[in-house]
């Protein structure tokens, strides 16, 4: 960019002088309309479990979650993203509980849509909450995650959620071809209006630790890793190829995960494809901000709002954030 004019004729501070002019020239704005609130749901009645590594975040049974959903609706938050905490007795090598029509997720989806039909409900399509080994797919005898065999289970899982009333299914597993397989399954069953939010650029990040504690998969995964299917944090061009493939297979929206450490990817995706682009402010990002605020090192409100503004400035149309309720309250003034 070539600057026009010379100092003192050109003074950039002139438009920064007063609040009204700063507001008039503001390029990016955060509103409650961009928030998706991730929630952890567990079996039982009246149950609340604090997530130690995520201060302020709780695992909630359905009756408690309904109260949380009501608060979200009243604050104007458009959607919740559900993540189940599955009892260890239901975790198997074949992840059969993932497509149980009477399972936790379909029951929660049905209840949420019955009570709050205007609230968007997004479900996670992946097998790690359901496998005894904590991987996102089926494995062979060596522990390698099997791609094509996993697709069949993911398709059943997505259809199970759609038939329960999920507005959006969000495959986060990073198997090749899963968007096309899921779209075909949904279409064949007549679920043509179920949207797919593809975790297209999901990196094998170190920032997921608290989330795995929250859903109870950390212990199952142990010292294992997800390098053979999640993306290398060093790569950017690969992310564009992943997004292009998912869109060609039938994705309606795409996701970049994690968020703040990968805002360069958000910008590249938005510039290249100009499709609905979402980013996830993941558990590790949340935990870092919370820890700094609790130690008095950062102003929590100011830093949370600035971090969310960074997502918008990078090109994100929506943000999954554990700060959604707090941020919505902040924005009310």
Predicted regions and their residues:
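Alpha/beta enzyme core
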Residues: 2-7, 18, 31-36, 42-333
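N-terminal carbohydrate-binding accessory modules
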Residues: 12-30
């Amino acid at each position: 960019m070539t600057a026009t004019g010379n100092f003192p004729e050109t003074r950039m501070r002139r438009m920064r002088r007063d609040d009204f002019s700063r507001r008039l020239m503001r390029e990016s704005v955060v509103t409650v309309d961009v928030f998706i609130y991730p929630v952890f749901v567990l079996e039982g009645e009246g149950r609340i479990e604090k997530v130690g590594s995520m201060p302020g975040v709780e695992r909630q049974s359905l009756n408690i979650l309904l109260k949380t959903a009501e608060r979200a609706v009243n604050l104007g938050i458009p959607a919740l993203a559900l993540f189940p905490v599955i009892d260890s007795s239901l975790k198997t090598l074949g992840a059969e509980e993932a497509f149980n029509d009477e399972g936790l997720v379909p029951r929660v989806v049905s209840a949420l849509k019955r009570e709050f039909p205007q609230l968007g409900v997004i479900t996670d399509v992946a097998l790690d909450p359901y496998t005894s080994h904590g991987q996102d797919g089926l494995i062979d005898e060596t522990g390698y995650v099997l791609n094509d065999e996993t697709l069949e289970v993911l398709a059943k899982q997505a259809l199970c959620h759609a038939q329960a009333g999920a507005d959006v299914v969000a495959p986060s597993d990073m198997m090749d071809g899963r968007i096309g397989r899921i779209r075909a399954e949904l279409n064949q069953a007549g679920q043509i209006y179920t949207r797919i939010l593809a975790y297209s650029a999901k990196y094998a990040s170190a920032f997921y630790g608290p989330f795995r504690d929250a859903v109870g998969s950390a212990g199952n995964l142990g010292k294992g890793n997800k390098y053979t299917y999640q993306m290398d944090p060093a790569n950017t061009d690969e992310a564009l190829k992943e997004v292009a493939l998912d869109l060609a297979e039938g994705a309606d929206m795409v996701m970049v995960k994690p968020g703040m450490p990968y805002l360069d990817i958000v910008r590249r995706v938005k510039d290249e494809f100009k499709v609905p682009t979402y980013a996830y402010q993941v558990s590790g990002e949340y935990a870092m901000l919370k820890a700094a605020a609790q130690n008095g090192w950062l102003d929590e409100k100011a830093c949370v709002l600035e971090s969310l503004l960074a997502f918008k400035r990078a090109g994100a149309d929506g943000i999954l954030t554990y700060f959604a309720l707090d941020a919505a309250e902040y924005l009310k003034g």
